[in-house]
């Protein structure tokens, strides 16, 4: 964390689908939270790449991030993530679901009466 520049923090879920089954939490795990705290305390810009198979609850963190890329589970397509980070490709993806602010919003649907997600169905940014 020394020196100039920005920090690219790669966080995500521990593998769960191929082994012991479902993971019951949608929170950022404690190890990644500790990493993020160190990044925040550095005073540098922080770009977060999240590797997960579903939206995690990030509301308490995202305001501290200067950039965010939900890379999902890219597998062999991970090279595409670096293309986006280094500006070789302009991201064009859109959410095919609503990203909840908190666990109490689950299940969430864009037709819900009090619909107020963190990111709405169809949300997506590019450069």
Give the ranges of each region predicted by the language model.
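C-terminal non-catalytic regions of proteins with extracellular/luminal or membrane-system context
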Residues: 1-127
């Amino acid at each position: 964390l020394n020196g100039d520049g920005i920090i690219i923090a790669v966080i995500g879920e521990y593998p769960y689908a191929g082994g012991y089954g479902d993971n019951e939490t949608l929170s950022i795990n404690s190890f990644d939270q500790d990493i993020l705290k160190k990044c925040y305390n550095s005073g540098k810009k922080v770009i977060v790449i999240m590797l997960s198979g579903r939206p995690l609850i990030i509301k308490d963190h995202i305001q501290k991030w200067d950039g965010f890329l939900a890379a999902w589970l890219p597998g062999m397509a991970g090279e595409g993530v670096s293309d986006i980070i280094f500006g070789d490709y302009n991201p064009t993806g859109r959410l095919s679901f609503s990203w909840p602010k908190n666990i109490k919003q689950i299940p969430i649907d864009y037709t819900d009466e009090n619909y107020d997600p963190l990111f709405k169905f169809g949300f997506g940014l590019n450069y």
